[in-house]
A protein has these predicted regions:
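GST superfamily/GST-like fold recognition
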Residues: 64-65, 102-130, 135-143, 151
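Residue-level recognition of oxygen-bearing side chains
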Residues: 23, 133, 146
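Terminal-tail/helix-coil boundary detector
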Residues: 150-165
Length: 165
């Protein structure tokens, strides 16, 4: 489906293919603006949302967790990415000390995106427990009815804890 050979990909009713998680979640949020999962286009808040989505995609996903899944990368190389993740989670932990969600007090698609990506920590044995604000944040998101419903539908319940397995 995705010509690049990876997920996610969304095929719209008219056959249009949309790829990349950040683009997909913004598109979905824009279809139901009354849910307020994304600030209105053209606002500074929307730019901040895009900044968080880019941070999740580039710093946590592609530049952090993804290389840890590749068997061909030696441990010394993987340690570079683990160190990057430590720095990024320290940053997130500090931000979440005074913010309920990435955008402050309002849940957004950036939170959904980070929740999914941060679930990979247990699969690559990256311990999130030192980042207590991140762990609390993940708990808040993981107990949301829509999140639990989606995770049950995908067979992901129980969702990974903060501890590596």
């Amino acid at each position: 489906m995705n010509p690049l050979g990876y997920v996610p990909a969304l095929v719209l009713d008219d056959g249009t293919l949309l790829t990349e998680g950040a683009a997909i979640v913004q598109y979905i949020a824009d279809q139901v603006p009354s849910k307020k999962l994304a600030p209105p286009n053209g606002t500074i808040e929307r730019a901040r949302l895009q900044a968080w989505l880019n941070f999740c995609s580039s710093e946590i996903h592609k530049g952090g967790f993804s290389p840890l899944f590749y068997k061909g990368i030696p441990e010394e190389g993987k340690n570079v990415f683990r160190a990057r993740l430590v720095a990024r989670f320290i940053y997130l932990n500090e931000h979440l000390k005074s913010n309920e969600y990435l955008m402050g007090h309002d849940y957004s698609v950036a939170d959904a995106h980070l929740f999914v990506v941060s679930n990979w920590a247990s699969w690559v044995k990256f311990d999130l427990s030192p980042y207590t604000n991140v762990v609390s944040y993940r708990g808040r998101i993981g107990t949301r009815a829509a999140v639990r419903s989606a995770m049950e539908a995908e067979g992901l319940i129980p969702w990974p804890s903060a501890q590596p397995q």
